[in-house]
Amino acid sequence: VDGIRLDAADVLDFDFMRALRRTAAEVKEDFWLMGEVIHGDYSRWVNGETLHSVTNYALHKALYSGHNDHNYFEIAHTVKYLQNMGNLDLYNFVDNHDVERIYTKLSNKAHFAPVHVLLYTLPGVPSIYYGSEFGIEGKKEKFSDDSLRPALDIKDYADAVQKNPCTALIAALGKIRQHTPALSYGSYAELQLTNRQFAFARDLDGIRVIVTVNNDDNAADMSLPAGNCAEYIGTLTGRKVPVQDGRINVTVAANSGEIWVPAGEMPEYIPVKTETADIEKVQEETEETTSTQTESPAQKTITAAEETAAAKAEDIQPEKTADTSAISAENSFPENTEAAAEKEKTVIVAVSYTHLR
């Protein structure tokens, strides 16, 4: 056992949690204690004396509603709010055994891509609830949570990485995070923000990684302050862009995201292409699938812009822009302490809800 998840930690006695932390440290040096906390100042529970991490419900809410409402200001504001609590290793998630599946919550299923790009790149420890990597749906019912906790036959998903764009994206993001230390240890700096586009940097040891997301049905151009290098490469698409006058000019595809890293400065990095990176190919394969089979959640494409066009028209607020390219000294990256090392972990919640694997 490498860790324990404490249910309803916000009602546990603090003296008990302190004693548990001391005991856990004696049993195993890197034993991990995570608590379920719905709201409040997370630093009350996450510190050197009590727990290592708690559930980040604040970001959970912002990730899906910020996309449903085309409001990246909500996500950016939430990140700043959490940063003000201190350098916490929060457990980031988009769904779990108590809430509806992310694929069900999203009004536009194509937003599965930018949501998960943010999950894997914003400060914190990313987690995936079993089954959601396949894009399965689950709606919370009045008297039962059975639909949120189905039994899955893994044989049904044996080739999911090759055929399911949701799974391909999750697999790629996991590899990218593993080979990009700045996503685990780097400081956070907001670079550009509108209702529908969002860009930020993760800086570590002179290396700047840039993350761009777009929740609009049209591609968007962005000009962003880059790091001290000659060229950047998109880790999902493999696309290369030059640094010109200290900036990169990139185009972010509709309803997508990209993680840009300095080319040639990260020898461990191996470019990864996913089905979601090739929008036309995904749409063609989806049409072939739906023409021969009844559409299921795991078969739906995450890049089908047609769904949005057919959806109910919504009122679009005036576009607001904030230039936040300056990096504050307050956002200096943490040292590689034991606490910072927790950020490198990616947690997968198994069918057994009380254990981390």
Question: Predicted regions: what is each one?
Answer:
Residues 3-90, 108-109, 118, 135-172, ...:
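Active-site-proximal helices and loops of the catalytic beta/alpha 8
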Residues 102-107:
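Short, solvent-exposed helix-loop connector elements
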Residues 123-135:
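Substrate-binding cleft of secreted/luminal carbohydrate-active enzymes
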Residues 274-341:
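Ser/Thr/Gly/Pro-rich low-complexity, disordered linker/stalk segments of secreted
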Residues 353-355:
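Conserved small/polar residues in nucleotide/adenosyl-binding loops
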Residues 134-285, 317, 332, 346:
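Carbohydrate-interacting/catalytic domains
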